[in-house]
Amino acid sequence: MKMFLGYYNKSVILTYIGSAAAVLGMALALSGKMKYAVLCLVVCGVADLFDGMIARRCKRTEEEKEFGIQIDSLTDMVSFAVFPVVISFAMGNTSWYHIAISVFYVLAAITRLGFFNVSASISSETKFYTGLPVTFASLIVVSAFIAGSILSITEIIMPVCLFVTAVLFILKIKIAKPKGIAYLLLGLIAIALAVAVIFVGG
């Protein structure tokens, strides 16, 4: 009999790493270390990008598969719904309209996650996502941080970025699921963004 609940094997290790990076990133953001906080968001994105691919290569029971799906969704909530909002607040975006945009963003993110979970339970064989996957928030928010740092308009670009991303979460558009070389391309983009954050981030 196991002493602890859950599963702790290579099929979920990246998901746990993503959760840990999100919590660390929020702590760094609230401590004013924005560059390192944003780098943690890059880690969250990379972890979520590849965790499913690794999990599918592992031999798992049905219970382990379901557990993986659930913790992946919960991790996405922390990493790509709450974490970007904390980054925005830590940048000083705390006026009433910033808060309103942040609330809309979180609601859109959880709506997108809920829709994905229902769709996945019905069919996992589709070749397209409906609505922007929340993982892409990492690329968008990090890009906004870089642009804002270069142009000194972070207080403007971040709320706009969150609003547009929120709309894309719930907009009924089809987005092809990444496969093959797309994973390599997204990985290279993540590396490029991380390097840019290091050199131009505040």
Whereabouts are the PLM-identified features?
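Topogenic membrane-insertion module of multi-pass membrane proteins
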Residues: 1-52, 168-201
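"…together with the soluble PPM/PP2C metallo-phosphatase catalytic core" -> "…together
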Residues: 3-15, 22-26, 34, 39, ...
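Multi-pass membrane catalytic core of lipid/isoprenoid biosynthesis enzymes
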Residues: 11-16, 57-112
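Hydrophobic alpha-helical transmembrane segments
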Residues: 15-26, 44-52, 75-85, 103-108, ...
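Helix-coil boundary and interhelical linker segments in multi-pass alpha-helical membrane proteins
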Residues: 24-39, 78, 82-103, 143-158, ...
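Hydrophobic core segments of alpha-helical transmembrane domains in multi-pass membrane proteins
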Residues: 37-44, 99-107, 155-166, 185-188
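C-terminal ends of transmembrane helices
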Residues: 53-61, 110-124, 167-177
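C-terminal membrane-associated helical module and adjoining short loops/tails
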Residues: 125-202
